[in-house]
Amino acid sequence: MTRRRCGSADYSYQAFSYQPIACSTSQKHRLTAQKEVLLSVDIILASASPRRQELLSLVVRTFRVVPSGFDESLVPVDLAPAQHVLYSACMKARDVAARFPDALVISADTIVVVDEAILGKPADAAEAARMLRMLSGRTHEVYTGVAVVRAEVERADVERTEVTFGPLSDEIIARYVASGEPMDKAGAYAIQGRAVVLIKSVCGCYPNVVGLPLHKLSCILSEFGI
């Protein structure tokens, strides 16, 4: 697998016609000046993830949670990782936006990629252990697609981060799996939880690995005047 230099990105996704957004200093100032706008906008997070809720609260003062009903198994299997998460994030946002057409809907989707294989959430403890053995002592990639939809306007972007695990013995893996933490996490680990001691290094956006790339999201929200 050809690995990009840390920090570089080159994504395109014709189906949703998105363009990566460069967040300038003036946009950041405008974001600060327009905080009061948040009070008049019905903002919905289309995710039940407690981690995404915690991260979004750092950017948005008030929002509500309406989990999307989009079936992630419907994502086309032939998509590259960046396109995979963009497709899923956009479909999640559209699902909720269709029910709340006046709201601003935020959604995200995260996957772990190693050896060109996409690792989602493990189905059971055995699969969690298998995933962790794949990650042991190696560098993998975490992709998160984030989408924002309001009325007929849709913006989306993707973030990529490299994470390197230290060597994991069978005992360490068994103990971590027994904690239950891997079971609802892409790639079978939570960087913000017990797995932090298993990780040797992170290259790129840390919140992206948790599940919501805050810089990308802030730049997208600025396009909506928020």
Q: What are the roles of these predicted feature ranges?
A:
Residues 11-18:
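Aromatic (phenylalanine/tyrosine) cluster motif
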Residues 20, 29:
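Cationic, low-complexity basic patches in intrinsically disordered or flexible, solvent-exposed regions
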